[in-house]
Amino acid sequence: MGMRGVVLAVALGAPGVVAADCAGVTIMACPVEGSGKILEVCAEPKGFTYSFGPAGAPELRLAAPYAKGPVIPWPGVGRAIWSAVRFPADGFAYEAWISVDRLTENAAPVGGVDVFAMPGDELVASIDCRPGPWFGDIMGPEDAMADAGYCWDWAMGLWREGGCP
């Protein structure tokens, strides 16, 4: 199975599926476990956006420009295919992530956001997406970075604008 553009549906027409409110491309949109809130990550023309809260009225909105290299790419090994986008704000980093077990046939995606205190990356909160139908594009963050003209330099461990060696 090719990794570029792998979209996990996550049945957009099914009842209970989160309707994304992105101006650009939806990376993930899911209901949050144990609440009526929505977690959403979008790829916009200049970078990624993150929103969290009730549908249509998020309590928190953050942005991470492509130039800051906010995507933590899947290294290509391990049981799970995953991707994450990091949104720094006010002494914290909100890391929205999506993952799927690649060894389990028809595995449902999992996702959520981990909140880290900065500096030091101390995990202070972890919020999971509710199981069930929701939308996620596993390789969407990497694809958005590439579409914006960036490539991941594996030797340096960072995103470069333009070509990579």
Predicted segments — roles?
Residues 20-165:
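Cysteine-centric segments in proteins
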Residues 2-9:
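Sec-dependent signal peptide recognition
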Residues 14-17:
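N-terminal signal peptide c-region/cleavage motif recognized by signal peptidases
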